[in-house]
């Protein structure tokens, strides 16, 4: 029977026949070897959440036709307990990742997808000028290899997507199975809780606590016992009150605990429901549609067709001879290759990258699902722990309280049971007294009858002795003795002592006392009846009393003497009848509810005693049997002997029958054992056959795995070399990134400090501006009042002047041109005054009126000097209009010079009056001019601050995007900063320059918040109104008020630091692995201390010492030596003695050992102590411990007879391995 075995965290599924395993432990050992899960951490569940044990496993093996599914859980998945109400910390997520690293199977780590690389066509420029036969064939051959690799990758991506989809479905299904397991576990605890609640309700519904005190005061205090004592005296009321208070306390405590347990159980139920919802939502959200991750059939067909066509075209080109590659063919071939490069290769690469992206996406989905699964397992573990705590409390504390509760209620129930029990007790005492009296009478009668019988027997024996004793002496000598009467005498004596004891014990028991007890019982029943107790109790009293009154001792009947066989049959018949009667009695007792008495005690309506009076016939039958037996005589002796023999035969036959039956049972058992052994033997044979098949399959798999492992090791070594280089690059990038992060942090702090300073300055400027505005309004009011006063005064002076002019005109009508000039001046003054008055009324400004008056005076002077009235009037109007416009646009005031004032002084009195008015208006004009200049300065400062604030905001947004963070709006239009990948691709630079900000063209910002703020800033620059100003400040403040910017930047750098630590850790691991590989490799040149070298014995070639070093180096390596063996001892500068020469001669027989140097021809490496090398060794690998360099200069430094000038090393090495 094949079964599906699913790993709950990896989703891996295997199908295996579980009948191959003899026991559950053997099956667990298989899972341990398969998924490296400890024996104690294995948890096996069935689809309904049942936990697999030995019995269930045997049942599964027995169901040969049913296919079962077993889910394998690692208990470590439940070790990270997670309260669903609490938020997850970063440490918890780190623990999940570490747990996944420890739980995931090592083979899963090899499923690293390789991104498809570009075609060799895209790496070269296809041009017919640079193409030739060899270049084309090489390029096409390389591209064919790339095409084959691409096909393999596509097939692998498809398999990976399909397998990962199945893994995801299995993980989701495992989550549901684990939830079912939790439901089963909680169901038992909830049933236990419900049973406790039900039991408590039963105890509370008895209402004993409410009624006992009333019953005690109204019933027990009114009933008396036989001695006249009240029944209430048998109970301690204070103790009962204490018990009642304890029951109330227990009731409150138990109810309170049950409510608390109910809250926890309901909470666990809600949490379980939430887990169900999360699993369902996770299944809907994560479980991908298989169609989504499958390429369309047309795309697959297109891919296959493109590969096939490209391969066929390439093979056609490669099959051509070199002579066929003429100029025209090269031109067409270049066009064809260029077309393949732009169309075919591009399409193939696009399809492969799309499939690679899909495989990566679904792999990330599986990883996220594993993390979410461990979170849910932690929540399930939390709920299970809470439920277990509830179970312990229910079984320990609550059960003890309920037992106490029940015991206390039983004590209180005794209050209601005492009247009933005491009445029955009195009736039972009455019955016992009746029994004693009857026994006493019977005993006295028996003694009298025994005495008469003995005397009669003595008389009979004496008569027989008298008649036959003389002859009977031949048979016996004691026929006349009465030894058999000794036993009867002892019985008689015992009866006499027994009679005395009975008389002493029951001397107080008499008919009078017996009748007195009967009267008390009847009185007691009447009292109970008067107290209106339950009628069933009174009926029970009367029934029992009637039984006690009619009680007579039964005598055994000896009417019938039956055999053993008949006795057994009779007993069986009685037993069957008794069972039927018990069944009827049981049904009658529990079906007749009305006959049940009140209180906790349940009494039966069946009579406890029965008046079985022996009939006269039975007595007569007993007497007749006795007399018949006496009359049998000696004729019956033979019959008794034969019966005894027959009985012995029957006993022997029964024993033999039992023995035969026992032997038959043994034979049957042996036959059963033999058949079981045969079945087990066949099962073992079948199991052994399957195990052999499985072993052969595993052996083949192991061989393939070892082969694949060797290939993977080679690929892994190649990848490690690439990873070492990439790690170095990453470390350099990390160091640069750290420097950049420090610079960004310092610049950020400076900018924040500047921003705070500018905020304070701006706030001070706003306060001063408001104060200036208030002062300006006050000055404006004063100015208007002063202006009004001066205007009125000026009107009065003007009228007076007009009167004087009119008088002067009347007196000097005939004067010269000078008087006419004065008259024309007066007219121009009038017109100017009227115009200035109108302008001052409309604009309410003193500057326009005063300027008009001054210009009118200047024009009148010029006109008088030119003697042209009409020309001066036109010029005066034009200049007044121009000057007024200039005054309004430039917001400036021109004052008359000293020369002009002097010329006016020399003019008429009207000029002096104008001078005095102008002098009075000058202080007001200067003060207003100062206020306007300050307001303009404040406005310029405000504009500068707003521009500076906008620049700071822009810089901060740019910094955020430079480190991969994007400032956007959330669904509530609040600022949020998100991590966005690929955000830095279009940025011109990654760090802001210290001299200034980037221009808008140089700073592409993708933030929609920045776009909105930029729009507000542009509106403010155009309008300079307060509404735009407030909107701009409120938007910018949202970034800094809640420290959103600072938090995001700090967190980003913390993530970068964490990533740097992770990369450093991975680099360290890879470095250690690299060091391990480096230490294991054998060095072939440039030996150093610590290197591994291959040492070989040298060969003896005949080369003279005077040969040149170059020829010697080119002829052989360190192992191709022509020198004799070394002289044993290290090289020294001392002269050799005769003893050393003898030793050297002895060592000539041994061949020297040298290190193998395949790529070095300038030096030789000889082993210092070859004596330590075991004999008959062809080679050994040694670790170099010491090197000493020598150059051959003379005979002393040339023990190996090397050419002069040759370099050699003396090496000390330890043996690592040898052969």
Swiss-Prot record:
Biased composition (Low complexity): 831-863
Membrane topology category: Peripheral membrane protein
GO molecular function: molecular adaptor activity; protein kinase binding; SNARE binding
Record field: compositional bias (Polar residues): 818-830, 909-925
Ranges annotated as biased composition (Basic and acidic residues): 864-877
Predominant place of localization: membrane
Keyword field: Autophagy, Coiled coil, Membrane, Protein transport, Transport, Vacuole
GO BP: autophagy of mitochondrion; cellular response to nitrogen starvation; cytoplasm to vacuole targeting by the Cvt pathway; pexophagy; piecemeal microautophagy of the nucleus; positive regulation of autophagosome assembly; protein localization to phagophore assembly site; protein-containing complex localization
InterPro entries in the cross-refs: ATG11, Atg11_C, ATG17-like_dom
GO cellular component labels: Atg1/ULK1 kinase complex; phagophore assembly site membrane; vacuolar membrane
Subcellular location: Preautophagosomal structure membrane; Vacuole membrane
Annotated stretches, region: Disordered: 811-882, 895-926
Stretches of the chain forming a coiled coil according to its record: 636-824, 1052-1081
Role played: Involved in cytoplasm to vacuole transport (Cvt), pexophagy, mitophagy and nucleophagy. Recruits mitochondria for their selective degradation via autophagy (mitophagy) during starvation. Works as scaffold proteins that recruit ATG proteins to the pre-autophagosome (PAS), the site of vesicle/autophagosome formation. Required for the Cvt vesicles completion.
SUBUNIT field: Homodimer.
Family to which this protein belongs: Belongs to the ATG11 family.
Database matches in PANTHER family: RB1-INDUCIBLE COILED-COIL, RB1-INDUCIBLE COILED-COIL PROTEIN 1
Name of this protein: Autophagy-related protein 11
Organism per entry: Vanderwaltozyma polyspora (strain ATCC 22028 / DSM 70294 / BCRC 21397 / CBS 2163 / NBRC 10782 / NRRL Y-8283 / UCD 57-17) (Kluyveromyces polysporus)
């Amino acid at each position: 029977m094949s079964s599906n075995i699913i790993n709950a965290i990896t989703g891996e599924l295997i199908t295996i026949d579980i009948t191959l395993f003899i026991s559950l432990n053997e099956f667990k050992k298989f899972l341990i070897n398969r998924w490296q899960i400890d024996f104690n951490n294995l948890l096996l569940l069935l689809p309904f959440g049942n936990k697999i044990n030995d019995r269930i496993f045997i049942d599964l093996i027995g169901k040969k036709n049913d296919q079962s599914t077993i889910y394998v859980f690692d208990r470590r998945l439940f070790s990270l307990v997670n309260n669903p109400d609490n938020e997850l910390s970063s440490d918890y997520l780190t623990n999940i990742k570490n747990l996944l690293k420890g739980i995931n199977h090592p083979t899963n780590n090899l499923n690293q997808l390789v991104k498809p690389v570009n075609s060799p066509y895209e790496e070269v420029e296809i041009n017919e000028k640079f193409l030739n036969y060899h270049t084309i064939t090489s390029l096409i051959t390389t591209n064919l290899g790339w095409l084959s690799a691409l096909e393999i990758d596509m097939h692998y991506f498809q398999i990976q997507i399909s397998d990962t989809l199945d893994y995801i479905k299995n993980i989701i299904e495992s989550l549901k199975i684990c939830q079912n397991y939790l439901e089963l576990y909680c169901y038992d605890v909830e049933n236990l809780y419900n049973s406790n609640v039900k039991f408590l309700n039963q105890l509370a519904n008895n209402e004993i606590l409410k009624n006992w005190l009333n019953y005690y005061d109204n019933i027990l205090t009114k009933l008396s016992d036989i001695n006249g004592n009240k029944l209430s005296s048998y109970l301690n009321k204070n103790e009962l009150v204490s018990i009642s208070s304890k029951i109330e306390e227990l009731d409150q405590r138990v109810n309170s605990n049950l409510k608390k347990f109910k809250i926890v159980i309901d909470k666990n139920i809600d949490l379980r429901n939430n887990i169900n919802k999360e699993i369902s939502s996770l299944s809907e959200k994560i479980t991908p549609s298989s169609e989504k991750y499958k390429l369309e059939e047309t795309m697959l067909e297109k891919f296959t067709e493109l590969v096939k066509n490209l391969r066929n075209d390439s093979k056609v080109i490669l099959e051509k001879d070199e002579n066929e590659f003429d100029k025209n063919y090269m031109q067409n071939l270049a066009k064809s290759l260029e077309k393949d490069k732009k169309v075919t290769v591009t399409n193939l690469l696009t399809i492969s990258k799309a499939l690679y992206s899909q495989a990566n996406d679904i792999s990330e989905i599986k990883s996220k699902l594993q993390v979410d699964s461990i979170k849910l397992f932690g929540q399930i573990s939390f709920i299970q722990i809470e439920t277990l705590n509830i179970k312990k409390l229910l079984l320990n504390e609550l059960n003890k309280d309920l037992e106490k509760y029940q015991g206390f209620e039983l004590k209180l129930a005794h209050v209601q049971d005492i009247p009933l029990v005491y009445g029955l007790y009195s009736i039972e005492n009455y019955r016992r007294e009746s029994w004693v009296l009857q026994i006493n009478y019977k005993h006295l009668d028996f003694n009298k009858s025994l005495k008469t019988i003995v005397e009669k027997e003595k008389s009979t024996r004496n008569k027989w002795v008298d008649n036959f004793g003389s002859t009977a002496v031949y048979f016996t000598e004691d026929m006349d003795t009465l030894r058999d009467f000794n036993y009867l005498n002892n019985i008689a004596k015992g009866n006499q002592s027994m009679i005395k004891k009975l008389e002493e014990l029951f001397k107080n028991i008499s008919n009078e006392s017996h009748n007195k007890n009967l009267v008390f019982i009847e009185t007691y029943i009447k009292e109970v009846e008067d107290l209106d107790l339950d009628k069933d109790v009174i009926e029970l009293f009367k029934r029992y009393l009637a039984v006690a009154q009619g009680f007579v001792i039964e005598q055994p009947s000896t009417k019938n003497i039956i055999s053993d066989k008949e006795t057994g049959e009779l007993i069986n018949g009685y037993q069957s009848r008794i069972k039927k009667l018990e069944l009827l009695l049981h049904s009658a007792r529990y079906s007749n509810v009305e006959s049940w008495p009140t209180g906790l005690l349940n009494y039966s309506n069946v009579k406890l005693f029965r008046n079985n009076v022996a009939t006269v016939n039975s007595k007569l039958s007993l007497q007749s049997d006795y007399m018949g037996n006496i009359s049998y005589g000696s004729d019956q002796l033979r019959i008794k002997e034969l019966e005894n023999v027959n009985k012995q035969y029957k006993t022997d036959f029964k024993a033999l029958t039992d023995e035969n039956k026992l032997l038959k049972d043994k034979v049957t058992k042996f036959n059963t054992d033999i058949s079981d052994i045969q079945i087990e033997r066949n099962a073992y044979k079948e199991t052994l056959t399957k195990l052999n098949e499985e072993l052969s399959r595993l052996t083949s798999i192991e061989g393939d795995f070892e082969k694949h492992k060797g290939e993977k090791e080679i690929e892994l070594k190649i990848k490690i070399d690439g990873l070492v280089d990439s790690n170095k690059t990453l470390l350099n990038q990390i160091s640069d990134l750290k420097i950049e992060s420090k610079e960004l942090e310092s610049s950020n702090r400076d900018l924040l400090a500047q921003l705070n300073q500018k905020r304070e300055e701006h706030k001070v400027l706003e306060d001063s501006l408001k104060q200036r505005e208030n002062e300006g309004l006050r000055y404006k009011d004063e100015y208007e009042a002063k202006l009004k006063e001066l205007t009125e005064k000026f009107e009065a002076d003007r009228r007076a002047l007009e009167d004087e002019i009119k008088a002067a005109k009347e007196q000097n009508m005939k004067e010269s041109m000078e008087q006419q000039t004065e008259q024309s001046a007066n007219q121009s003054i009038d017109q100017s005054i009227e115009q200035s008055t109108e302008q001052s009324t409309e604009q309410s400004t003193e500057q326009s009126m005063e300027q008009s008056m001054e210009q009118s005076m200047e024009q009148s002077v010029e006109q008088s000097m030119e003697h042209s009235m009409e020309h001066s009037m036109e010029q005066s109007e034009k200049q007044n209009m121009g000057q007024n416009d200039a005054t309004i646009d430039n917001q400036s005031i021109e004052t008359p010079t000293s020369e002009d004032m002097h010329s006016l002084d020399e003019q008429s009195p009207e000029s002096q009056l104008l001078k005095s008015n102008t002098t009075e208006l000058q202080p007001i004009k200067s003060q207003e001019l100062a206020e306007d200049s300050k307001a303009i300065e404040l406005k310029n400062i405000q504009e500068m601050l707003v521009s500076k604030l906008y620049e700071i905001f822009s810089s901060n947004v740019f910094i955020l995007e430079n480190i991969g963070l994007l400032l956007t709006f959330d669904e509530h239009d609040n600022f949020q900063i998100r991590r966005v990948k690929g955000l830095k691709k279009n940025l011109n630079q990654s760090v802001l320059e210290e001299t200034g900000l980037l221009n808008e063209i140089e700073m592409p910002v993708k933030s929609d918040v920045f776009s909105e703020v930029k729009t507000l800033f542009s509106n403010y620059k155009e309008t300079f109104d307060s509404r735009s100003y407030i909107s701009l400040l409120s938007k910018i403040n949202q970034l800094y008020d809640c420290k959103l910017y600072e938090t995001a930047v700090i967190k980003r750098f913390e993530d970068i630091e964490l990533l740097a630590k992770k990369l450093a850790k991975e680099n360290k691991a890879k470095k250690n692995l690299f060091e391990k590989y480096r230490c294991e490799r054998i060095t072939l040149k440039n030996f150093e201390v610590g290197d591994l070298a291959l040492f070989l014995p040298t060969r003896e070639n005949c080369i003279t010492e005077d040969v040149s070093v170059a020829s010697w180096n080119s002829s052989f390596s360190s192992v191709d030596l022509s020198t004799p063996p070394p002289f044993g001892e290290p090289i020294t500068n001392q002269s050799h003695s005769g003893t050393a020469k003898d030793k050297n001669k002895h060592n000539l027989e041994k061949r020297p050992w040298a290190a193998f140097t395949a790529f070095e021809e300038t030096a030789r490496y000889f082993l210092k102590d070859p004596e330590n090398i075991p004999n008959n060794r062809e080679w050994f690998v040694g670790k170099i411990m010491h090197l000493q360099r020598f150059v051959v200069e003379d005979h002393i430094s040339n023990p190996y007879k090397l050419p002069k000038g040759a370099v050699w090393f003396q090496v000390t090495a330890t043996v690592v391995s040898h052969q």
